[in-house]
Curated annotation (Swiss-Prot):
Gene transcribed to yield this protein: GOLM2
Statement: the UniProt record of this protein carries the keyword Membrane: yes
Residues with the Phosphoserine modification: 233, 275
InterPro entries (UniProt xref): GOLM1/CASC4
Species lineage: Eukaryota, Metazoa, Chordata, Craniata, Vertebrata
Entry protein name: Protein GOLM2
Length: 380
């Protein structure tokens, strides 16, 4: 390339060669495309010819097979013709025998016609029997229908009576529940009346006690109650020691002789004024089914375990001056009575629930159908 293009301009010869090469490539590509398309067409024609050859071979095989089948059919037809000729000979002999049988049948027919009169009489008799049997069948069918109707009526009656029994059981249960509720309300009202009675009695006794005590004692009692708001067994002797040591216990209006007089008050006055009502309420609660007895001297914040034994029960102070004043005890009494009534209602509700549950279990154990059957048998 360098030697040929040394005496010419650079750049013209390579472009011409490139154009020639492109033309040659295009011609070769066109020739290749035309040859390949022709080759494809020829291959398709060869495939079609091969398919035609296969179809002709298959048709030839079918024709040969059909020819052999036709030859076999010709042979079989020939055999059948021979067999039919033999059958014809036998049928002719049978026909002759049948003609003889026909003659004998005609003779038998005459005999049977003679017996028809007797058979007609028998048929008439059998028809009469059939009519009687049909009537008997209809009568029995009517009886069966009546029995079925009676059975359905009895079943419905049994179901109705069982339903009525169930309704009566429900009504009796409702009445029983209402009676239990009425008894519970009556019991609570009686408890309230007794509590009010004992309250009034306690108030009357308190009035008499207040009139019997001198005027200077309540002032000392108020001072002692302020010191003994948390009732404990340790506060009682401590309060007494303070009163004895100080003489007037910090109050100038009270002297030692007044304290001596207060200590000489009878033992009945030293008891709390609501001890009767508390004692009666304690007795009422102890007789309840599930209630636990409350101590009359028990303070509301005393801890009680589930077995009813008080762990750390704080008793009311035994200070005689404080017991003579009805203020704190009368304030605590309505709360104690309210707690007593609450506990009684809870116990009553628990007993009512248990009774209701026992009634339901008893009714579930008793089948209403058996009860209805028993009632039905008694009615029959």
């Amino acid at each position: 390339m360098v030697g040929f293009g040394a005496n010419r301009r650079a750049g013209r010869l390579p472009s011409l060669v490139l154009a020639v090469l492109l033309v040659v490539i295009a011609v070769l590509a066109f020739n290749y495309w035309s040859i390949s398309s022709r080759h494809v067409l020829l291959q398709e024609e060869v495939a079609e010819l091969q398919g035609q050859v296969q179809r002709t071979e298959v048709a030839r095989g079918r024709l040969e097979k059909r020819n052999s089948d036709l030859l076999l059919l010709v042979d079989s037809h020939k055999k059948q013709i021979d067999q039919k000729e033999a059958d014809y000979g036998r049928l002719s002999s049978r026909l002759q025998a049948r003609e003889g049988l026909g003659k004998r049948c005609e003779d038998d027919k005459v005999k049977l016609q003679n017996n028809i009169s007797y058979q007609m009489a028998d048929i008439h008799h059998l028809k009469e029997q059939l009519a009687e049997l049909r009537q008997e069948f209809l009568r029995q069918e009517d009886q069966l229908q009546d029995y079925r109707k009676n059975n359905t009526y009895l079943v419905k009656r049994l179901e109705y009576e069982s339903f009525q029994c169930g309704q009566q059981i429900k009504e009796l249960r409702a009445q029983h529940e209402e009676n239990i509720k009425k008894l519970a309300d009556q019991f609570l009202q009686e408890q309230k009346q007794e509590a009010h009675k004992f309250e009034s009695k306690g108030g009357n006794e308190l009035d008499t006690d207040n009139h019997a005590v001198p005027k200077n004692i309540p002032e000392v009692a108020e001072n002692g109650a302020g010191k003994n708001e948390e009732p404990s067994s340790h506060h009682i002797p401590h309060g007494k020691e303070q009163i004895k040591r100080g003489g007037d216990a910090g109050m100038p209006g009270i002297e030692e002789n007044d304290l001596a007089k207060a200590e000489d008050v009878p033992v009945a006055l030293k008891k709390p004024p609501v001890s009767f009502s508390q004692y009666e309420s304690h007795q009422v609660i102890s007789h309840l089914p599930t209630g636990q007895p409350l101590s009359p001297n028990m303070v509301p914040d005393s801890h009680i375990n589930h077995n009813g034994n008080s762990r750390t029960s704080k008793q009311n102070p035994s200070n005689p001056l404080q017991r003579l004043i009805p203020g704190p005890n009368l304030e605590n009494e309505p709360r104690i009575q309210a707690e007593v009534l609450k506990q009684a209602t809870k116990d009553r509700a628990g007993d009512f629930h248990k009774l209701k549950q026992n009634d339901e279990e008893r009714e579930l154990q008793m089948d209403p159908a058996d009860y209805g059957k028993q009632r039905f048998n008694d009615a029959l």
